[in-house]
Amino acid sequence: MKLQWIKLIGLILGLMAGAIIVPYFIPSIDLHLTERLQSPSLTYLFGTDWLGRDVFLRSVQALACSVRVGLSSALFTGLFALFLAVLGNSSHGLYQTVRWAIDTFLALPHILLLILLTLCFGSDANAIIWAVTLSHWPRLTQLLLQEMKTIGRSRYVLHAEQFGSSRFMALCKHGFPYISAQWVIGLILLFPHILMHIAALTFLGFGLEPSQPTLGGMLSESNRYLMLGYWWLGLLPGVLLILIVLILAKAGRAMTQQVTHYAND
């Protein structure tokens, strides 16, 4: 169990470090119009695009951007969901209000809501982070709300209230240690979901400026050239997106099984 957690934490820290450090080591991606649409070679591992830019360097830069935005979005979403779970269990009225908000947001078309929020916040990384946070919180909040409700009935929370602590503070102090594993796993499972939605947003032309390389944007731009035989334009961005999503999804499932096994024992 401990080894699995160490591996997982190492994976997350590695992604964070890579997303922050890698862009500083990528040389400036200049236009080389004389080398447009070059096929993969030793000079250009994954070829060049219609403006002569190195597809490999752009893909690495796009992946780093997606990981940075995705990690920030997942963290803010998790913190917001945790806050609502604690707040919702502070009183019966707040519980019903949070439940109503969850049901309302889950009833809305997910991608459409994400697009509308992105349009409201603008075209930069912060806009995507806010849009993702305000559209992806319901399911994690739903899980944490029920877990916190069970903890709220425990003796130590009731005793803390009897000794003068507010219910909100009692749940913060005694509840989080018991749901921390579920919270972390929820974030890990949410991360690939967020990455896919960020890619979908940028594929449709929302979110970041066109000058910022993104995996979804590169896939969208490659559409017009794929039918002409320039297959490499969409290969690497697509492979990188699929790989990172599969790795994170597998890590999340593995940790879920470990926690379930540990709880049953």
Residue ranges with predicted function:
Residues 22-25, 66-103, 114-115:
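Transmembrane-helix boundary motif in ABC transporter permease subunits
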Residues 74, 123-172, 182-191:
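Membrane-cytosol interface at the C-terminal ends of specific transmembrane alpha-helices
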Residues 48-53, 91, 159-178, 219:
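Short helix-to-coil transition segments within interhelical loops
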Residues 1-30, 179, 242, 246:
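N-terminal signal-anchor/first transmembrane alpha helix
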Residues 64-80, 168-200:
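Transmembrane alpha-helices
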Residues 115, 124, 129, 133, ...:
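Non-cytoplasmic
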Residues 45, 49, 89, 95-150:
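Generic hydrophobic transmembrane alpha-helix motif, especially the helices
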Residues 135, 181, 188-189, 230-265:
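C-terminal transmembrane helix and the adjacent membrane-cytosol boundary/short C-terminal tail
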